[in-house]
C-alpha cells in the first residue's frame, strides 16, 4: 500500500515548521540563560554586599545604644538583665570584638574603622578603592555645524554732516568674483565705405622664370659620305672562364693509425665565480617552552579609606 505523495509533503512541511519553532525557542532560551544568569548572579551579589553593610551598621548602632544603656545603668545604680549573645553569635561576632568596640566607642570613627583593615577582611562598604585612571580614548568624530547665529543689533545712526569715506569702515571688502558673461548683442548697422587708398606706383620687374620643357625631336638628317676601309683583323687567343665544380669522388681507403700523443702538461683551472644565492630554507621547528618565571611579590593589603562615613543619627 503506497501513501499519497501530497500527504507526505504536507506532513514534512508541518514537521519542518515544528522543528524550526523548537530550534528557535531553544536558541532564545539558551541566549536568555547566558545573559540573565550572570546578571542575576551579579545583582544578588550586590544585594548581599549591601545587606551585609547595612547589617553591620545596624549592629554598630545597637552596640552603641547598649553601651549607652550600660553607662546609664551604672550611673543610676539600677541592675538590668544580661544582654543575650545569640544575635552576635549568629553573625560571627565574638565578645572580644564587642569589648574592643565598646572601648573605642567614645571616638568618632568612619566605617572603615568599624570593619577593620586587617589582612583577609572585607570593608563594610563592600567595594574596593577606585583604580587608576585609564588612558584617554580616541578623539570622537567632528560634530555637525551649529545653527547660524542671530543677526546683530543695528549700529548707531551717523550724524547729518558726516560723509562716508574709505577710512570710515573697519573691515576690508575684497573684490567679488567676476560675473557670468552676458548674452551677445544684436548685429550693428554696416559702416560707411572707406576712402580710396594711395596708388602702389610702378612695379619692379620680377626674377626670370624657370626653364621650359625640352622641345620635340627634329627631322633626321641626310646620309653622310662613305668612309675609308679599315685595317685587317687579327686573331687573338683568349682563355675561357673555368667551368663549375664536378661531383665529389668516392672516399679513399682508411689510413694507418697514428702514433699516440704525449701526455698533457696543463694545470687544473682555478675555482669558478661564486654562484647565485639559493632559495631560503624552510622555517625551523619551534623551540621548547621556557621554564615558568618566579612568583611576584605579594601586593599591598587593601584599606578602607575609600568607604563613606557611617550614617549615624544626630548626636553620635
Curated annotation (Swiss-Prot):
Low complexity biased stretches: 127-157, 183-204, 219-234, 256-266, 276-295
Keyword Repeat: yes
Region (Triple-helical region): 128-157, 176-202, 206-235, 240-266, 269-304
Pfam family, one: Col_cuticle_N
Record's signal peptide: 1-36
The keyword Chloroplast appears for this protein: no
Region: Disordered, residue numbers: 127-316
UniProt xrefs under InterPro entries: Col_cuticle_N, Collagen
GO molecular function: structural constituent of cuticle
Gene Ontology, cellular component aspect: collagen trimer
Feature: compositional bias, Pro residues: 205-217, 241-251, 307-316
Keyword terms: Collagen, Cuticle, Disulfide bond, Repeat, Signal
Family per record: Belongs to the cuticular collagen family.
Description of how the protein assembles with itself and partners: Collagen polypeptide chains are complexed within the cuticle by disulfide bonds and other types of covalent cross-links.
Function comment: Nematode cuticles are composed largely of collagen-like proteins. The cuticle functions both as an exoskeleton and as a barrier to protect the worm from its environment.
Name assigned to this protein: Cuticle collagen 12
Taxon lineage: Eukaryota, Metazoa, Ecdysozoa, Nematoda, Chromadorea
Name of the coding gene: col-12
Amino acid at each position: 500500500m503506497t501513501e499519497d505523495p501530497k500527504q507526505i509533503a504536507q506532513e514534512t512541511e508541518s514537521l519542518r515548521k515544528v522543528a524550526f519553532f523548537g530550534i528557535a525557542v531553544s536558541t532564545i532560551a539558551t541566549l536568555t540563560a547566558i545573559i540573565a544568569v550572570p546578571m542575576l548572579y551579579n545583582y544578588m551579589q550586590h544585594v548581599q554586599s549591601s545587606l551585609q553593610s547595612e547589617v553591620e551598621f545596624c549592629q554598630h548602632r545597637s552596640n552603641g545604644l547598649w553601651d549607652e544603656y550600660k553607662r546609664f545603668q551604672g550611673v543610676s545604680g539600677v541592675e538590668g538583665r544580661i544582654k543575650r549573645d545569640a544575635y552576635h553569635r549568629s553573625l560571627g561576632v565574638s565578645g572580644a570584638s564587642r569589648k574592643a568596640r565598646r572601648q573605642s566607642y567614645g571616638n568618632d570613627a568612619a566605617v572603615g574603622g568599624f570593619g577593620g583593615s586587617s589582612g583577609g577582611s572585607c570593608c563594610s562598604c563592600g567595594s574596593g578603592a577606585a583604580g587608576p585612571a585609564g588612558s584617554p580614548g580616541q578623539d570622537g568624530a567632528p560634530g555637525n555645524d551649529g545653527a547660524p547665529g542671530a543677526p546683530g543689533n543695528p549700529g548707531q545712526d551717523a550724524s547729518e554732516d558726516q560723509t562716508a569715506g574709505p577710512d570710515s569702515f573697519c573691515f576690508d571688502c575684497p573684490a567679488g568674483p567676476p560675473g557670468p558673461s552676458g548674452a551677445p548683442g544684436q548685429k550693428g548697422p554696416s559702416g560707411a565705405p572707406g576712402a580710396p587708398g594711395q596708388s602702389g606706383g610702378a612695379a619692379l620687374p620680377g626674377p626670370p622664370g624657370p626653364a621650359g620643357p625640352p622641345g620635340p625631336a627634329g627631322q633626321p638628317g641626310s646620309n653622310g659620305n662613305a668612309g675609308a676601309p679599315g685595317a685587317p683583323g687579327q686573331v687573338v687567343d683568349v682563355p675561357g672562364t673555368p667551368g663549375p665544380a664536378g661531383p665529389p669522388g668516392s672516399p679513399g681507403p682508411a689510413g694507418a693509425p697514428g702514433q699516440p700523443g704525449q701526455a698533457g702538461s696543463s694545470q687544473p683551472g682555478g675555482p669558478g665565480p661564486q654562484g647565485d644565492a639559493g632559495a631560503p630554507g624552510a622555517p625551523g621547528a619551534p623551540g621548547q617552552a621556557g621554564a615558568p618565571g618566579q612568583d611576584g611579590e605579594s601586593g599591598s593589603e587593601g584599606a578602607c579609606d575609600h568607604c563613606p562615613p557611617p550614617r549615624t543619627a544626630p548626636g553620635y
